Amino acid sequence: MGLLEFLGFGNKTKQVKEFMAKGAVIIDVRTEGEFKSGHIEGSKNIPLHEISSKIDAIKKLQKPIIACCRSGMRSGQANMILKNNGIESMNGGGWLSLKNKL
């Protein structure tokens, strides 16, 4: 597995569909201002700098998580934090690209 695949930048369409079939929650890790300028309907906004402090609340959702942001870099970081805390998650990449996969 290459570095980009490890960070979640491979072909995601199949994985996104599998996660959504399991009732995944989409967490947009952009800033509140970025989120307000446009986002995926039904997604939750938890900025990247708040992810670590929200782990318990995210675990209580008992759902897989698809993290997204503007380009995929911040969601890649969020994905690693979530995985390191035992949460089933994936990097959904940029929110506009992810929206087209739903």
Residue ranges with predicted function:
Residues 2-15, 22-24, 32-63, 73-102:
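Rhodanese-like catalytic fold shared by cysteine-dependent sulfurtransferases
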Residues 28:
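N-terminal glycine-rich beta->alpha transition that marks the start or flank
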